[in-house]
C-alpha cells in the first residue's frame, strides 16, 4: 500500500492540523483545482470507452458501475440520476456497491475484500456480452472490483477500470484503463477527497456523453427528462418553449397534447404534424430529434 499515490503523504499538508481554518481551506481548494487537469490526459481513452458504450447501449446493452465504499456510492449516485435526467429505465444504468444497499450509508466490514462477491453481484443482474462494466476503485486494487471485472471479461462484456493510481491492479484485468493521477490526498489515504471528485467527474462524462449519443439531448437541453415533480414539469415546458419559439402557455398546451413527451412535442411543432407521425419519425430515426425533424 505504501507505494500507492493515493496512500502517500501530501507535502503541502504535512502540518494540516496546525493550519488556521482559512489556511486549510485555501490549501484544500488549491489541491482540488488539480483534479480537472488530472483528467485531461485520459480524454482520448475516455473517448474510446464512450464510443463503445454508445454502440452497446443502442444494441440493448447496459452501463454498469461497480465499486466499494466511496467509489461504489459514486457509481450508484450517477446511475440513479440517469433516471430523472435522461428518462432511462432503472435497469439500463446500474450502480452496484460492495455490501449492497446498506453500504450506501454505513461501512460494511470486509465487503470490499470479497473477490467472489463482485462476480456474484454481476451474475445477480444477469450480466451479458452486450453490457459495459466500469469497475471503480481509487486505489485500483479492490478485490471486489477485480473479481467483477474478471467475471465480466469471461462473458465478453466491455470492461473498464477507473482508478486514481498508475499501473493499478484492476487496469490489468480490463479492456480499457482510465487512470486519473490526482496526487496524494490532503488527508493521507482519504480517497473521498480528490480521488472521489475525479471519479465523479469521469462518471458524469461517461453517462452524459453516452446519453447524448443515444439521442437524449437536443443542443444542450435534456429532451428526454422524466418529469417526476413540479420543477421538472416546468423545465420540460420551458425546453419546448425554447426550442419551438412558443409562449409558455403554447408550450404547455403542446406538452399536454404530446402526453408529456418533450421529444414528440418538439417534432409535432417543428414538422407541423400529428402526434402519431411524430412518434413514427422518432422510431425511424433512433429516437434522435434532429434526425426525426429532417426526415
From Swiss-Prot:
It comes from the Bacteria. GO terms for molecular function: carbohydrate derivative binding; carbon-oxygen lyase activity; ether hydrolase activity. The keyword DNA repair does not apply. PROSITE patterns: GCKR (PS01272), SIS (PS51464). Keywords: Carbohydrate metabolism, Lyase. The keyword rRNA processing does not apply. It catalyses: N-acetyl-D-muramate 6-phosphate + H2O = N-acetyl-D-glucosamine 6-phosphate + (R)-lactate. The active site is at residues 81, 112. Pathway: Amino-sugar metabolism; N-acetylmuramate degradation. Its EC number is 4.2.1.126. Residues 53-216 form the SIS domain. One of its GO terms (biological process) is N-acetylmuramic acid catabolic process. Homodimer. Specifically catalyzes the cleavage of the D-lactyl ether substituent of MurNAc 6-phosphate, producing GlcNAc 6-phosphate and D-lactate. Belongs to the GCKR-like family. MurNAc-6-P etherase subfamily. A lyase-type mechanism (elimination/hydration) is suggested for the cleavage of the lactyl ether bond of MurNAc 6-phosphate, with the formation of an alpha,beta-unsaturated aldehyde intermediate with (E)-stereochemistry, followed by the syn addition of water to give product. NCBIfam families: N-acetylmuramic acid 6-phosphate etherase, PRK05441.1, PRK12570.1. This is N-acetylmuramic acid 6-phosphate etherase. It comes from Staphylococcus haemolyticus (strain JCSC1435). The gene is murQ.
Amino acid at each position: 500500500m505504501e507505494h500507492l499515490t493515493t496512500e502517500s503523504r501530501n507535502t503541502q499538508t504535512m502540518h494540516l492540523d496546525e493550519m488556521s481554518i482559512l489556511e486549510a481551506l485555501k490549501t484544500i481548494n488549491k489541491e482540488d483545482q488539480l483534479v480537472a487537469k488530472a483528467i485531461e490526459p485520459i480524454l482520448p481513452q475516455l473517448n474510446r470507452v464512450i464510443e463503445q458504450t454508445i454502440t452497446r447501449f443502442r444494441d440493448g446493452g447496459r452501463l454498469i458501475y461497480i465499486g466499494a465504499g466511496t467509489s461504489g456510492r459514486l457509481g450508484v449516485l450517477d446511475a440513479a440520476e440517469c433516471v430523472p435526467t435522461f428518462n432511462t429505465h432503472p435497469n439500463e444504468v446500474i450502480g452496484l456497491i460492495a455490501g449492497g444497499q446498506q453500504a450506501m450509508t454505513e461501512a460494511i466490514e470486509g465487503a470490499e475484500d470479497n473477490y467472489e462477491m463482485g462476480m456474484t453481484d454481476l451474475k445477480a443482474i444477469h450480466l451479458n456480452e452486450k453490457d459495459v462494466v466500469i469497475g471503480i476503485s481509487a486505489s485500483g486494487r479492490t478485490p471486489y472490483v477485480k473479481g467483477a471485472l474478471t467475471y465480466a471479461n469471461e462473458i465478453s462484456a466491455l470492461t473498464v477500470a477507473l482508478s486514481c493510481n498508475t499501473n493499478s491492479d484492476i487496469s490489468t484485468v480490463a479492456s480499457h484503463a482510465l487512470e486519473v493521477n490526482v496526487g496524494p490526498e490532503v488527508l493521507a489515504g482519504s480517497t473521498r477527497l480528490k480521488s472521489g471528485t475525479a471519479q465523479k467527474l469521469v462518471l458524469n462524462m461517461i453517462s452524459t456523453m453516452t446519453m447524448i449519443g443515444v439521442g437524449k439531448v437536443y443542443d444542450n437541453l435534456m429532451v428526454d427528462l422524466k418529469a417526476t415533480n413540479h420543477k421538472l414539469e416546468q423545465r420540460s415546458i420551458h425546453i419546448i418553449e425554447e426550442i419551438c419559439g412558443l409562449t409558455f402557455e403554447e408550450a404547455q398546451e403542446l406538452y399536454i397534447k404530446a402526453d408529456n413527451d418533450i421529444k414528440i412535442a418538439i417534432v409535432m411543432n417543428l414538422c407541423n404534424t400529428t402526434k402519431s407521425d411524430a412518434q413514427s419519425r422518432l422510431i425511424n430515426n433512433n429516437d434522435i430529434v434532429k434526425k426525426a425533424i429532417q426526415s
